[in-house]
Amino acid sequence: MTETDSRKSVRSGGRGKKDTDTVQPLFDSFRHAFDGILTGLGERNMKIHCLMAVLVVAFGFILRISIMEWCICLVLFGLIMALELVNTAIEAVVDLVTHEYRPLAKAAKDTAAGAVLIASIMAAITGLIIFIPRLLAFFHL
């Protein structure tokens, strides 16, 4: 069984597909991707990231950040949320493989979480660089 065959089997709930059905329609690919996003949105940390994004957008409108600053914020939103989805996927796969304590399982989960943390810290620093001068000007300080 090839990797593609096993992916089709997993996505179809183990029912398998005919050998003649070799090309998955594009909308099915998008549906699976949106299912993954919805799964991720159920995670506590993703909810926190979404709340922070809403706050940044609100402050962005209030403080009238520039187009370039909007672009930076949007790229950072996408990066953090994508990393959070990858982190969720890695955690799910590790949990699928073992529920016992294993050093490699811990390393996989911790490393994925660390990637999200680094991106989040850098996004927060970038946000401070963008928003602090505008907040000071807004309050005439």
How would you name each of these model-derived features?
Residues 105-111:
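Membrane-interface alpha-helices at helix entry/exit sites of multi-pass transporters
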Residues 1-89, 97, 101-103, 115-141:
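Hydrophobic alpha-helical transmembrane segments
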